């Protein structure tokens, strides 16, 4: 629909929009910000792929699935919040090499091959669940792309023992 349009710098989708087509905003090189409404529940294949300037993505609804290569080579993307996600498909964030941190909900069940391939700067994964949930996720999925990232587990209160835990401070993830 809008692929290759370099005049788009920001997209704010109203709640009445319930779906996006594959490749809808593919190669929109000047796009820096996307905000989805509550009507969007999944993102299709290559929907924002190769949007080289995309820095800020806000999901106001419950995004359950991110499709194949949805954010492929979005090289300016640095942080991401996926609190309600259940499926991240093949190569969804491959080549997002400026991605530094993500917040992932404990609803995550499936991470397919190369979901975070070539995200070499991904330092921190802030997981909203506990260690046992993460290890189960790890056993059932290929999370090798996250091998060099520190995984933090959510704890509202400061733990009395060591480990990688985090909490929200002023709306942002903060390690304990």
Which residues fall in each region the model found?
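Consensus positions within tandem repeat domains that build extended binding/scaffold surfaces
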Residues: 1-3, 21-26, 44-47, 67-70, ...
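Structural signature of tandem-repeat unit edges
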Residues: 5-19, 29-42, 52-65, 75-87, ...
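A structural signal for leucine-rich repeat
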Residues: 72, 94, 116-117, 137-142
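Short conserved micro-motifs at the rims of enzyme active sites and ligand-binding pockets
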Residues: 137-138, 163-167
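Noncatalytic linker/hinge segments flanking ATPase motor cores
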Residues: 142-143, 171
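Acidic surface patches and DE-rich sequence motifs
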Residues: 155, 168-169
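Short linear proline/tyrosine/threonine-rich motifs used for host-factor recruitment
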Residues: 167, 173-175
């Amino acid at each position: 629909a809008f692929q290759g349009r370099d005049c788009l710098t920001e997209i704010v989708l109203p709640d009445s929009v319930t779906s996006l087509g594959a490749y809808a905003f593919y190669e929109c090189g000047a796009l820096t910000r996307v905000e989805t409404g509550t009507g969007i529940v999944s993102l299709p294949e290559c929907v924002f792929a190769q949007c080289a300037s995309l820095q800020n993505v806000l999901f106001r609804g419950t995004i359950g699935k991110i499709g194949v290569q949805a954010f492929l080579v979005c090289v300016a993307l640095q942080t991401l919040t996926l609190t309600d996600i259940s499926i991240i498909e093949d190569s969804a964030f491959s080549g997002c090499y400026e991605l530094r941190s993500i917040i992932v909900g404990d609803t995550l069940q499936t991470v397919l091959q190369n979901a975070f391939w070539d995200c070499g700067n991904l330092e921190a994964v802030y997981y909203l669940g506990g260690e046992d949930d993460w290890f189960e996720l790890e056993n059932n999925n290929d999370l090798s792309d996250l091998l060099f990232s520190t995984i933090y587990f959510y704890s509202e209160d400061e733990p009395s023992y060591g480990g990688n835990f985090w909490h929200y401070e002023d709306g942002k993830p903060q390690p304990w």
